[in-house]
């Protein structure tokens, strides 16, 4: 039995990591929480922050690694919650890999309003991105998703637990399904 791929995305501060952790931890099946930031932070020499000009080639490589890791887990029977900033331009590699491997793929965009996003980001600790201009730019990247606009969840008024519940329901109902 193969697993399912769930790409859980949105701008920094949207709650992706917290929600992905809840979805993966409370799952009824074998489930992996794939933190895509790890694939970027593994680059020790020549790293370019992925939102800066000049990062496109690096980002293409990192997305290929993400897709490979996610599909390998799923082929092994694990559901995979891919937690990261996965814009529209990186949906095709996930879609192609899912189609080729016969996997189910859902694309879920957490998109709180900008004020909520910036507020949540200010409250985050650690070495998370704090540049309001960069966060605003990444928020704008998810502002108009064209044919995938129906894959957006406005989480402005939801806490992490409520958002995780909504994600589970939506994925179960196939609302955000792209493949399968």
What are these regions (language model features)?
Residues 18-71:
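Conserved substrate/cofactor phosphate-moiety recognition/catalytic segment
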Residues 5:
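Walker A (P-loop) ATP-phosphate-binding motif of ABC ATPase nucleotide-binding domains
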Residues 15:
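Conserved glycine(s) of the Walker
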Residues 123-169, 173-180:
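Small-molecule kinase domains that catalyze NTP-dependent phosphoryl transfer to phosphate-bearing small molecules
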Residues 57-101, 105:
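Glycine-rich phosphate-binding loop used to anchor ATP phosphates in small-molecule kinases
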Residues 8:
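Hydrophobic anchor at the beta1->P-loop junction of P-loop NTPases
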Residues 101-121, 153:
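Conserved phosphate-donor/acceptor-positioning beta-strand/loop module used by diverse small-molecule
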């Amino acid at each position: 039995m193969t697993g399912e791929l769930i790409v859980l995305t949105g701008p920094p501060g949207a709650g992706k990591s917290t929600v992905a952790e809840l979805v993966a931890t409370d799952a009824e099946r074998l489930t992996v929480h794939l933190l895509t930031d790890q694939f970027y932070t593994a680059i020790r020499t020549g790293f370019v922050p992925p939102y800066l000009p000049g990062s496109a080639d690096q980002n293409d490589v990192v997305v290929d690694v993400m897709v490979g890791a996610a599909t390998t887990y799923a082929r092994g029977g694990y559901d995979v919650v891919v937690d990261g900033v996965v814009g529209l331009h990186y949906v095709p590699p996930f879609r192609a890999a899912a189609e080729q491997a016969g996997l189910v793929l859902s694309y879920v965009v957490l998109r709180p309003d900008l004020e909520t996003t910036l507020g949540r980001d200010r409250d985050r600790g650690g070495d998370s991105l704090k540049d309001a201009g960069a966060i605003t730019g990444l928020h704008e990247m998810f502002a108009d998703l064209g044919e995938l606009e129906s894959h957006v969840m406005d989480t402005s008024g939801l806490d992490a637990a409520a958002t995780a519940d909504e994600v589970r329901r939506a994925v179960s109902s196939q609302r955000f399904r792209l493949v399968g």
